[in-house]
């Protein structure tokens, strides 16, 4: 008897699973807010140099740029005065007395003057946040395998609540970056534990639906953020607003049960049995739960218990050929998705459209995108869906090269389409990755995959700097990498309607069966080929 069959006995999709998925999904609303928070807390408004204290405030005091507006980073050394020598009339200097910002919003940019020579610090703040997610992946992955999924989930909620709230009271940009780094670390812990606890407590037949439901919560979070940002124009209060709720989520997480697979593989059979019986009671199958015994769990999951005695680590992802292929292809797909997604999602200001409206549109496209994704992964399969989502996104990004900046509507439409494809790609990847790696390596595999997505999101701002050389270079890089990620997906195994692999041997057997299935039609076709006679009758 497999774990899936044991889950069927206690209720594979009953009231427990609905409440379980709900408790895991609600905090994802806040994760979306944190990931995209700097769209609003780090907005760069129109600005120009503050004139010297003794200068007139008339517009002519400031030099004008090519667009007829005051220069953002320069001012005249001397006030225009006919009595000055001609060679000093047009002399300019940097903004020695600060800047004037044409905005009612209070952001980290306006508070710490992250403009002109300091404008790269704004991008650095976002990169530091992504670095936190990058570091948090392997750290919390290892801690989760050692101490369990549930305690790491709870502590990650607390860390995000504490560090996010502390960031709201930061006295300097450096302190702000430190707390944002910790926010990123905690988000990795939440994401990884949520994915594992979802797929391990939900039956195979509804796994795609539950995963997409959690993905939709991220979409709803994208709707909530612009409304919240519009209502709370002060960045400190906005930062505090999106962080405080995680104190409540940490309390609710105590109800979430530990992964049965982890309990069994860790030798905690009595706790695993009590957890299953509690689930059975909640699902109205108390009698079935009482029939289960520790001996039955040990007997039916003996294969898993034996494999648990062997310690697995990062090197095991490359030990056998099929795992090397899975790791390489998934890493490329994750990198491409994170790389391109955050180049579009964090570039809302670049399209010349109201950022509140455009963020709602960017969030809204996820609804049809994820709905189409769930239909596709449920009927066409994970591999085809993953491949085509990335290829379509790559085509949309490359198409931006040929659309002039004056055609804002078309450029925005292509960006929205590409972002929708990449959102669907994330939804598919979270499910696909958890299904491809065996239980003994699932958390490690998810951690490595998460790392590559975050590496991509960290590199994306640096790639945008290449646009100073030629405007089309960033889109060439983003689009090409996305096409490569989509192509890699076609080299993976299909997981549609298959139980989760428990051990490395399971995925090896699965790979051999797939090869054999492909070879049989070819052999049959060859055997049916009849050579033509060359002689006469």
Swiss-Prot record:
Tissue-level expression: Expressed mainly in kidney. In kidney, detected in almost all parts of the nephron, including macula densa cells. Expressed (at protein level) throughout the renal cortex. Widely distributed in the brain with no large regional differences. Expressed in the choroid plexus (CP, located in the ventricles of the brain). Expressed in developing bone. Weakly expressed in brain and eye.
Description of the deletion phenotype: Mice appear healthy and are fertile. Exhibit a loss of taurocholate, estrone sulfate and para-aminohippurate transport in kidney and of fluorescein (FL) transport in choroid plexus.
Keywords annotated in UniProt: Cell membrane, Detoxification, Glycoprotein, Ion transport, Lipid transport, Membrane, Phosphoprotein, Transmembrane, Transmembrane helix, Transport
Top-level taxon in the UniProt lineage: Eukaryota
GO terms of biological process kind: monoatomic ion transport; prostaglandin transport; response to toxic substance
Residue positions with a glycan: 81
Transmembrane segments: 12-32, 124-144, 151-171, 177-197, 213-233, 237-257, 328-348, 355-375, 384-404, 412-432, 472-492
One Gene Ontology MF term: prostaglandin transmembrane transporter activity
Disulfide cysteine pairs (residue numbers): none
GO cellular component: apical plasma membrane; basolateral plasma membrane
Keyword Transport included in the entry's annotation: yes
PROSITE patterns: MFS (PS50850)
Cytoplasmic topological segments: 1-11, 145-150, 198-212, 258-327, 376-383, 433-471
Reactions the enzyme catalyzes: estrone 3-sulfate(out) + glutarate(in) = estrone 3-sulfate(in) + glutarate(out); estrone 3-sulfate(in) + 2-oxoglutarate(out) = estrone 3-sulfate(out) + 2-oxoglutarate(in); taurocholate(out) + glutarate(in) = taurocholate(in) + glutarate(out); dehydroepiandrosterone 3-sulfate(out) + glutarate(in) = dehydroepiandrosterone 3-sulfate(in) + glutarate(out)
Record membrane topology: Multi-pass membrane protein
Region Disordered, annotated ranges: 513-537
Phosphoserine: residues bearing it: 4
Activity regulation as described: Expression inhibited by androgens such as testosterone.
Localization terms from the record: Basolateral cell membrane
A Pfam family that the UniProt record links to this protein: Sugar_tr
Topological domain spans for side Extracellular: 33-123, 172-176, 234-236, 349-354, 405-411, 493-537
Similarity section: Belongs to the major facilitator (TC 2.A.1) superfamily. Organic cation transporter (TC 2.A.1.19) family.
Summary of the function given for this chain in its UniProt record: Functions as an organic anion/dicarboxylate exchanger that couples organic anion uptake indirectly to the sodium gradient. Transports organic anions such as estrone 3-sulfate (E1S) and urate in exchange for dicarboxylates such as glutarate or ketoglutarate (2-oxoglutarate). Plays an important role in the excretion of endogenous and exogenous organic anions, especially from the kidney and the brain. E1S transport is pH- and chloride-dependent and may also involve E1S/cGMP exchange.
Name of the protein in its database record: Organic anion transporter 3
Species for this entry: Mus musculus (Mouse)
């Amino acid at each position: 008897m497999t774990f899936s069959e044991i889950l069927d006995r206690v209720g594979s999709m009953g009231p427990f699973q609905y409440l379980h998925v709900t408790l895991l999904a609600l905090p994802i609303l806040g994760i979306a807010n944190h990931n995209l928070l700097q769209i609003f807390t780090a907005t760069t408004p129109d600005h120009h140099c503050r004139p010297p204290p003794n200068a007139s405030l008339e517009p002519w005091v400031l030099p004008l740029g090519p667009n007829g507006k005051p220069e953002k980073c320069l001012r005249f050394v001397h006030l225009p005065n006919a009595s000055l020598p001609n060679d000093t009339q047009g002399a300019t200097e940097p903004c020695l007395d600060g800047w004037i910002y044409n905005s009612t919003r209070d952001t980290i940019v306006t508070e710490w003057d992250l403009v002109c020579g300091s404008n790269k610090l704004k991008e650095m703040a976002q990169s530091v946040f992504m670095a936190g997610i990058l570091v948090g992946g392997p750290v919390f992955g290892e801690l989760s395998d050692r101490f369990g999924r549930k305690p790491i989930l709870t502590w990650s909620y607390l860390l995000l609540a504490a560090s996010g709230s502390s960031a709201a009271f930061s006295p300097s940009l450096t302190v702000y970056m430190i707390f944002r780094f910790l926010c990123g670390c905690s988000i990795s812990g939440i994401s990884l534990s949520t994915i594992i606890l979802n797929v391990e407590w939900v039956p195979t037949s509804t796994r795609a639906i539950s995963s997409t439901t959690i993905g939709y919560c991220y979409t709803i979070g994208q709707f909530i953020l612009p409304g919240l940002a519009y209502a709370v124009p002060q960045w400190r209060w906005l930062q505090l607003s999106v962080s405080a709720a995680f104190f409540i989520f940490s309390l609710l997480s105590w109800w979430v049960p530990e992964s049965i697979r982890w309990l069994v593989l860790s030798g905690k059979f009595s706790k695993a049995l009590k957890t299953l019986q509690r689930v059975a009671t909640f699902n109205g199958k108390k009698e079935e739960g009482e029939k289960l015994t520790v001996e039955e769990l040990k007997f039916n999951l003996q294969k898993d218990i034996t494999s648990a005695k062997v310690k697995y680590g990062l090197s095991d992802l490359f030990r056998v050929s099929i795992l090397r292929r899975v790791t390489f292809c998934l890493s490329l797909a994750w990198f491409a998705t994170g790389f391109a997604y955050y180049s579009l999602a964090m570039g809302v200001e670049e399209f010349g459209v109201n950022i509140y409206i455009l963020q709602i549109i960017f969030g809204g496209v996820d609804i049809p995108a994820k709905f189409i994704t769930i239909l596709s992964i449920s009927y066409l399969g994970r591999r085809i869906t993953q491949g085509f989502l990335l290829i379509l996104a790559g085509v949309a990004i490359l198409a931006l090269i040929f659309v002039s900046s004056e055609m804002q509507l078309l450029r925005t439409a292509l960006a929205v389409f590409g972002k929708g494809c990449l959102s669907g790609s994330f939804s598919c990847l979270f499910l696909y990755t958890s299904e491809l790696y065996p239980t003994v390596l699932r958390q490690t595999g998810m951690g490595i995959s998460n790392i590559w997505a975050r590496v991509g999101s960290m590199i994306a701002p640096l790639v945008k700097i290449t646009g100073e050389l030629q405007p089309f270079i960033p889109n060439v890089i983003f689009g090409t990498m996305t096409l490569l990620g989509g192509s890699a997906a076609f080299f993976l195994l299909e997981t549609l309607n298959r139980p989760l692999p428990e051990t490395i041997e399971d995925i090896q057997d699965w790979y051999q069966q797939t090869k054999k299935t492909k070879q049989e039609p070819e052999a049959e076709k060859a055997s049916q080929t009849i050579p033509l006679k060359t002689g006469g009758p």
